[in-house]
C-alpha cells in the first residue's frame, strides 16, 4: 500500500497533499478553517445538486417549486435548510480564514493570497445569485438593487445592466441565467481551490510565530487529519443545531412572500454576510463612489502585502498592531449591524464613521503601528 501511495500517478498527488505533506509542528486550530471550507463546499455542491433536481427556474413556478421541495420531497426541508444555512457556515469559516491570514501575515504568500481573494469574490457572486433563486420579495428586490449598481459605470452602465437582466427589468431571463451561473460557479470554485492549494504547497504553511519552520516539520497524517476531524465535528454540531432548531434565524421573513415588482419592501437588505460591504456602499452619498468603496472593501486585501511595514511576519509579538487588528474586527461587527438598519439618523453617521475607520485602520494605522514596533524593538 505504501509503494502504491507513493508511486501511483493519481494517488501520489493526494499523498503529497494530504498524507506525507510536511507541516509545521506548531500550527493552531486557526489553521483548521481551510479544511472546514472544503467541507462546506462539498456540502453546498451535494445539497445544491439535489435541490436542482426539483427546482424550476421560471418566475411563475420558482417560489412554488421551493415550497414543493420543503413540503413534498423526502427530506426536502432538510436539504433546503442545509443549503441555506450551509452558505452562512461557509462565510463564517471564510471570514475566520481571512482573519487568520491577516493576523498571522499569511498575505506574504502572494500567489496563495491573491488566489484566495479571487475565491472570495467567486463565493460572494455565487451566494448572491443563489439568494435570488427562491424568488421571494427580498430575492427580487435584492437582485434589482445590486445589479442596478452597475448602472453607475459611466457611459456603458445602463446598457450593461439591461444586458445582465436580459430585458428592461429583473425577470424570467434574469432568473434563468442566475440559476445557470449559480450551478456552474461552485465547480469553477473547486478548480480555483485546487490552484489555491497548489500555490500553498509551493511554499508550505505559515505558522503562529511567522518564523521558518523547515527544521521542525511533521507529516500531515495522522497529526493534522485527526485535528481537522475534531474541527469537522465542531462545525457539523453547530451546523446541525442551526439547521434543525433555528433554520430561519439568519434569513429574512420578506423572502417568504412571493416576488412582487409592484410592492417594494420597506428595508431592502442582503444576507447577513454581505451587510458589512452593504453598509460601506450606503455610507457614500454618490452612487459611483459607493460602488467603488464596495469593491475596494474586499480588493483592499490585495494590497496588504504592500502595507506590511513590520520586520516580523505575524502579530503574535506585536501588541500595538494587535490592538489595531481587534479594533478592525469590532468595526466590521459595527458595519454588519449598520448594514441591517434603515437609512436614518443615527445609523447613517455611525455607518460613515465605521466605513472611514475600516479603510483608515488598514491603510494608515496598521502600517504606522508596524513601524513604531520596529523602532521600539530596535529592528531598523
Curated annotation (Swiss-Prot):
This is Cytochrome b. InterPro entries: Cyt_b/b6_C, Cyt_b/b6_C_sf, Cyt_b/b6_N, Cytb/b6-like_sf, Cytochrome_b, Cytochrome_b_C_euk/bac, Cytochrome_b_N_euk/bac, Di-haem_cyt_TM. GO terms for molecular function: metal ion binding; ubiquinol-cytochrome-c reductase activity. Gene3D superfamilies: Cytochrome Bc1 Complex, Chain C. Binds 2 heme b groups non-covalently. The cytochrome bc1 complex contains 11 subunits: 3 respiratory subunits (MT-CYB, CYC1 and UQCRFS1), 2 core proteins (UQCRC1 and UQCRC2) and 6 low-molecular weight proteins (UQCRH/QCR6, UQCRB/QCR7, UQCRQ/QCR8, UQCR10/QCR9, UQCR11/QCR10 and a cleavage product of UQCRFS1). This cytochrome bc1 complex then forms a dimer. The gene is MT-CYB. Its cofactor is heme b. Keywords: Electron transport, Heme, Iron, Membrane, Metal-binding, Mitochondrion, Mitochondrion inner membrane, Respiratory chain, Transmembrane, Transmembrane helix, Transport, Ubiquinone. The keyword Transit peptide does not apply. Its main location: mitochondrion. Heme 1 (or BL or b562) is low-potential and absorbs at about 562 nm, and heme 2 (or BH or b566) is high-potential and absorbs at about 566 nm. It is a multi-pass membrane protein. A ubiquinone binds at residue 201. One of its GO terms (biological process) is mitochondrial electron transport, ubiquinol to cytochrome c. Heme b b562 binds at residues 83, 182. It comes from Microtus oaxacensis (Tarabundi vole). Heme b b566 binds at residues 97, 196. It is found in: Mitochondrion inner membrane. The chain crosses the membrane at residues 33-53, 77-98, 113-133, 178-198, 226-246, 288-308, 320-340, 347-367. PANTHER family: CYTOCHROME B.
Amino acid at each position: 500500500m505504501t509503494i502504491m501511495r507513493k508511486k501511483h500517478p493519481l494517488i501520489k498527488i493526494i499523498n503529497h497533499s494530504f498524507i506525507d505533506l510536511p507541516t509545521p509542528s506548531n500550527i493552531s486550530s486557526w489553521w483548521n478553517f481551510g479544511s472546514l471550507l472544503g467541507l462546506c463546499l462539498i456540502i453546498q455542491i451535494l445539497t445544491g445538486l439535489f435541490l436542482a433536481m426539483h427546482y424550476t427556474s421560471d418566475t411563475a413556478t420558482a417560489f412554488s417549486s421551493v415550497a414543493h421541495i420543503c413540503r413534498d420531497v423526502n427530506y426536502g426541508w432538510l436539504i433546503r435548510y442545509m443549503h441555506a444555512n450551509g452558505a452562512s457556515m461557509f462565510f463564517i469559516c471564510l471570514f475566520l480564514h481571512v482573519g487568520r491570514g491577516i493576523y498571522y501575515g499569511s498575505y506574504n504568500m502572494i500567489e496563495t493570497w491573491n488566489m484566495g481573494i479571487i475565491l472570495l469574490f467567486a463565493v460572494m457572486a455565487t451566494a448572491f445569485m443563489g439568494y435570488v433563486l427562491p424568488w421571494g420579495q427580498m430575492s427580487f428586490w435584492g437582485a434589482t438593487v445590486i445589479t442596478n449598481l452597475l448602472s453607475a459605470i459611466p457611459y456603458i452602465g445602463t446598457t450593461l445592466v439591461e444586458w445582465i437582466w436580459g430585458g428592461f427589468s429583473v425577470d424570467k431571463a434574469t432568473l434563468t441565467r442566475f440559476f445557470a451561473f449559480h450551478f456552474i460557479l461552485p465547480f469553477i470554485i473547486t478548480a480555483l481551490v485546487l490552484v489555491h492549494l497548489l500555490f500553498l504547497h509551493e511554499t508550505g504553511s505559515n505558522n503562529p510565530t511567522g518564523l521558518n519552520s523547515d527544521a521542525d516539520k511533521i507529516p500531515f497524517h495522522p497529526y493534522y487529519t485527526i485535528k481537522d476531524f475534531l474541527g469537522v465535528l465542531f462545525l457539523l454540531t453547530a451546523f446541525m443545531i442551526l439547521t434543525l432548531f433555528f433554520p430561519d434565524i439568519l434569513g429574512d421573513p420578506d423572502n417568504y412572500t412571493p416576488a412582487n415588482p409592484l410592492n417594494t419592501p420597506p428595508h431592502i437588505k442582503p444576507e447577513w454576510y454581505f451587510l458589512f460591504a452593504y453598509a460601506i456602499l450606503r455610507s457614500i452619498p454618490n452612487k459611483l463612489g459607493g460602488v467603488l468603496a464596495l469593491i475596494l472593501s474586499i480588493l483592499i486585501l490585495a494590497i496588504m502585502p504592500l502595507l506590511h511595514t513590520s520586520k516580523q511576519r505575524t502579530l503574535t509579538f506585536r501588541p500595538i498592531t494587535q490592538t489595531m487588528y481587534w479594533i478592525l474586527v469590532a468595526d466590521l461587527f459595527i458595519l454588519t449591524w449598520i448594514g441591517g438598519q434603515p437609512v436614518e439618523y443615527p445609523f447613517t453617521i455611525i455607518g460613515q464613521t465605521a466605513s472611514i475607520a475600516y479603510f483608515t485602520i488598514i491603510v494608515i494605522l496598521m502600517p504606522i503601528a508596524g513601524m513604531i514596533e520596529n523602532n521600539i524593538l530596535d529592528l531598523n
